[in-house]
Regions:
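Generic C-terminus detector
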Residues: 92, 349-391
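Short acidic-glycine-tyrosine-enriched beta hairpin
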Residues: 88, 236-249, 253-258, 263, ...
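A short beta-strand-loop-beta hairpin characteristic of the jelly-roll/cupin
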Residues: 48-49, 58, 63-74, 147-148, ...
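Conserved short histidine dyad/triad with adjacent acidic residue
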Residues: 307-309, 319-337
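Short, conserved beta-strand element in jelly-roll/cupin
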Residues: 38-40, 87-91, 98, 133-141, ...
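A short hydrophobic beta-strand segment most commonly corresponding to one strand
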Residues: 94, 134-144, 260-279, 321, ...
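Transition-metal
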Residues: 1-209, 279-299, 323
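C-terminal, non-catalytic macromolecule-binding modules
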Residues: 261-313
Length: 391
């Protein structure tokens, strides 16, 4: 049981104030602090302090003793800590993304390797052979887009902009998955005069349309005034998560984080296919091949937790990670698992005890627990988030 020393990622879309206001993390340079990373990702591993006072990378510590740190099942299955845990602070919209499924990730990675595409090339889609399932848990009101709306909903929303592009009129005639695929690709392929004309029709509609998703389009247009991704809120569900609500992001499903602070848990992968709201490379044929053009009602997007005493367990449909929340104010609790775990203090104060060892976590602080350690006794006043594996 060791306290983690974590790193902050400074991406342009990040908030300059959220991590300071929530967790007292200093920002003397006033940089955008987008993400606090907890884990053993090779790009930026957390660090731990050993018994002799030396600070080492968590990734290196795990590498030296995988079975003890990860548990036999996780070590055999993944060979590394299979998840990355983050605090994500979005002050402005992130790009619309799609994550390929596991099989397509393996095929795409092998294909790009065989083609000799450098790992850091702009046109590289697959950085590894893994899928990238994600869970987002809102700490503040959190605005996002996730999955295609029901076709009847898309039809009614597209009516005011029917003249923007022929593919819109085409979809309105026969609203099905095939024509949604054509519409999605056509909007992304727009260039020059065609794109200017379409965006002019959309922006004119903003003058007469009220409420959502038009308000979200207005917000996004402040940052991406000339991006064809401005049509996306008409096609995708706009989701407002309240603090404490969570949502799982499936493979082959377009999504975007727009504003707010959340905990995010994800598999260890950097495979992203972009689909708008970005100046970066968009591989449209590869993107379309990796998207399921099927509707998902907004009411089905939230992940409902299962309550057991003071624990809320959020069901995850993959083995790469599990996520639960522990309310220490309700009762003292014993936390144990057959895998590694990262515990994060969401609010209040958590006191962790194991044998003679005592560790206090304040809001924003986290600890790593190895698979071979006995259960930890957790008490205090706040809430503790736990990421681990159920293998």
């Amino acid at each position: 049981m060791q306290k983690l020393i974590n790193s902050v990622q400074n991406y342009a879309w990040g908030s300059k104030t959220a991590l300071t206001e929530l967790y007292g993390i200093a920002n003397p340079q006033q940089q955008p602090m987008a993400e606090l990373w907890m884990g053993a990702h090779p790009k930026s591993s957390s660090r731990i302090t050993t018994a002799n006072g030396e600070t080492v990378s968590l990734r290196d510590a795990i590498e030296k003793n995988k079975t003890a740190m990860l548990g036999e099942a996780v070590a055999n299955r993944f060979g590394e800590l299979p998840f990355l845990f983050k605090v994500l602070c979005a002050a402005q919209p992130l790009s619309i993304q799609v994550h390929p499924n596991k099989r397509n990730s393996e095929i795409g990675f092998a294909k790009e390797n065989a083609a000799g595409i450098p790992m850091d090339a702009a046109e590289r889609n697959y950085k590894d052979p893994n899928h990238k399932p994600e869970l987002v848990f809102a700490l503040t009101p959190f605005l996002a887009m996730n999955a295609f709306r029901e076709f009847s909903d898309i039809v009614s929303l597209l009516q005011p902009v029917a003249g923007a592009h022929s593919a819109i009129a085409h979809f309105l005639q026969v609203p099905n998955a095939e024509r949604l695929s054509q519409l999605f690709a056509s909007l992304l392929n727009m260039q020059g005069e065609e794109k200017s004309r379409a965006l002019a029709v959309l922006k004119a509609a903003l003058n007469s349309q009220q409420g959502e998703p038009w308000q979200t389009i207005r917000v996004i247009s402040e940052y991406y005034p000339d991006d064809s991704g401005l049509f996306s809120p008409l096609l995708l569900n706009v989701v407002k998560l309240n603090p404490g609500e969570a949502m799982f992001l499936f493979a082959e499903t377009p999504h975007a984080y727009l504003q707010g602070v959340a905990l995010e848990v994800m598999a260890n992968s950097d495979n992203v296919l972009r689909a708008g709201l970005t100046p970066k490379y968009i591989d449209i044929p590869e993107l379309v091949a990796n998207v399921k053009f099927e509707p998902k009602p907004a009411g089905e997007l939230l992940t409902a937790p299962v309550k057991s005493g003071a624990e809320l367990d959020f069901p995850i449909p993959v083995d790469d990670f599990a996520f639960s929340l522990h309310d220490l104010a309700l009762q003292e609790t014993s936390i144990g698992q057959h895998s590694a775990a990262i515990l994060f203090c969401v609010e209040g104060e958590a006191v962790l005890r194991k044998d003679e060892q005592r560790l206090v976590l304040k809001p924003g602080e986290s600890a790593f627990i190895g698979a071979d350690e006995p259960p930890v006794n957790a008490s205090g006043t706040g809430r503790l988030a736990r990421v681990y594996n159920k293998l």
